[in-house]
């Protein structure tokens, strides 16, 4: 059972903030190796020099802007700096040059399970370095120490209507955390621009620590009748374990779910900077809004049906397919259902991607996880996902209206949560929201360290476009 932060008679969400002194002498992973903040501090001068070198080429051309870019949501425009990851249309995502398989091999794992820790991924995203096991254990403990939410946030969540959308609750709670923003207070008092990154870092770590607690409390209130969370934060455990425990999935009997959560959170943490949640966080942060307000904007973007709701839509569609086709279905039955979906004017959820033109490596990582566990591989719902992943691409190619007919990560993630008993599809995006904090918050720290300016693109009306391009 988890180690209590205070008496077990008090609910986690209603605790008053503990001082650092309360934990003096309890850090179990003290090490001579630099912690995350010290590692970042050492990396900043070199990155600032790199920025100077890039600025020396300010008059060079990066690419062209076509009408289709301006009308098509700015797709394909190289218009923002994003350090943690690069997305290639054919190779998929790379984190500081490392593939997902590289990260699974190199990044430290939890005390149980075999999957990489999301906090190790955050370390990599922020510093470009692979942390040692001791460095990650120390960082995990720091996140656990800072996981409790202020009493007023807990009361606010308790007072929300139980059927208020989880993402609305999530965004409001994160936004309200700016009451304790170190950056906002330091900026108001006067702060050297070169030092903006430090209170921003502190806020980002505080927010990362609290995201699982907020998300778990929303789940408890909406789907489990409210009251205290099933477990309090265990100072000796990692970020994902504590999230799982607060969702009611702690202990040795739930190790597979805890490992799935580690993989899911690490995979969904960053996917370049142009997606809505990442870009919204960067955009709002560029006005020097604190990390809490900035990421609240990212969460509200994530709540949009075109961004963060795909996993639940896939699951609903798969279950509808399962009910519509025979119990002993054939590949032709699946093929026919796919065509019926397309011919009715709907899309096949979980297929295609704004950038990728090959199968999503994140999808493949989750499928590999499932294939290695017979209890998932034999799940009829999962088997239908696997069958679709082989049949749907050929159907979509024949249909001819998609640039990428391959499955994306959403094809499998919701189904895996469903397998482990989480059937509340409306909540899936909140889990995504816990994960997505990793990349945008890491970049927000670099935005402050590099002194990147407020985002201010030029807009143009339709008549202006026509006047400019007619006669070309």
Swiss-Prot record:
Reaction catalysis annotation: propanoyl-CoA + oxaloacetate + H2O = (2S,3S)-2-methylcitrate + CoA + H(+); oxaloacetate + acetyl-CoA + H2O = citrate + CoA + H(+)
EC number: 2.3.3.5, 2.3.3.16
Temperature dependence comment: Optimum temperature is 49-54 degrees Celsius.
Residues that, per the record, bind oxaloacetate: 271, 353, 362, 436, 456
GO cellular component: mitochondrial matrix
Biological process, per Gene Ontology: carbohydrate metabolic process; citrate metabolic process; tricarboxylic acid cycle
Protein family according to the UniProt entry: Belongs to the citrate synthase family.
Protein name: 2-methylcitrate synthase, mitochondrial
């Amino acid at each position: 059972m988890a180690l209590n932060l205070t008496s077990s008679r008090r609910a986690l969400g209603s605790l008053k903030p503990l001082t650092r002194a309360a934990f003096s002498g309890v850090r179990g992973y003290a090490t001579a190796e630099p912690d995350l903040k010290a590692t970042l501090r050492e990396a900043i001068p070199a990155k600032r020099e790199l920025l100077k070198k890039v600025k020396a080429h300010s008059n060079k051309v990066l690419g062209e802007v076509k009408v289709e870019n301006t009308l098509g949501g700015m797709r394909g425009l190289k218009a923002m700096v994003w350090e943690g990851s690069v997305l290639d249309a054919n190779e998929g995502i790379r984190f500081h040059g490392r593939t997902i398989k590289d990260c699974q091999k190199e990044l430290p794992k939890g005390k149980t399970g075999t999957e990489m820790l999301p906090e190790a991924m955050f370390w990599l995203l922020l510093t470009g370095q692979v942390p040692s096991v001791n460095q990650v254990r120390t960082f995990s403990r720091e996140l656990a120490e800072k996981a409790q939410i202020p009493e007023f946030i807990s009361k606010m969540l308790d007072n929300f209507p139980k059927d208020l959308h989880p993402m609305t609750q999530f965004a409001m709670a994160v936004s309200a955390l700016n009451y304790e923003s170190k950056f906002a207070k330091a900026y108001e008092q006067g702060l050297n621009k070169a030092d903006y990154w430090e209170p921003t870092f502190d806020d980002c770590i505080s927010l990362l620590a609290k995201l699982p607690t907020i998300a778990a409390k929303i789940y408890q209130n909406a789907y489990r009748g409210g009251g205290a969370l099933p477990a309090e934060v265990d100072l000796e455990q990692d970020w994902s374990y504590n999230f799982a425990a607060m969702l009611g999935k702690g202990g040795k009997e739930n190790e597979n779910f805890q490992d799935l959560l580690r993989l899911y959170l690490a995979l969904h943490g960053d996917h370049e900077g142009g997606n809505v949640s990442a870009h919204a966080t960067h955009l709002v942060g560029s006005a020097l809004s604190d990390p809490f307000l900035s990421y609240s904007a990212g969460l509200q973007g994530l709540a949009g049906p075109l961004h963060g709701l795909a996993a639940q839509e896939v699951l609903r569609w798969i279950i509808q397919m399962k009910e519509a086709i025979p119990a002993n279905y054939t590949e032709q039955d699946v093929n026919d259902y796919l065509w019926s979906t397309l011919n009715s004017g709907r899309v096949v959820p979980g297929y295609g991607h704004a950038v990728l033109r090959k199968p999503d490596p994140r999808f493949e990582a989750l499928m590999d996880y499932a294939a290695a566990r017979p209890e998932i591989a034999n799940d009829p719902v999962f088997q239908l996902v696997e069958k679709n992943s082989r049949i749907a691409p050929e159907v979509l190619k024949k249909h001819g209206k998609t640039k990428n007919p391959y499955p994306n990560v959403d094809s499998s993630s919701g189904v895996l949560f469903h397998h482990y008993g989480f059937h509340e599809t409306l909540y899936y995006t909140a889990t995504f929201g816990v994960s997505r904090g990793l990349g945008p918050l890491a970049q927000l720290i670099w935005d402050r360290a590099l002194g990147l300016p407020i985002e201010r693109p030029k807009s143009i009306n339709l008549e202006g476009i026509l006047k400019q391009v007619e006669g070309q």
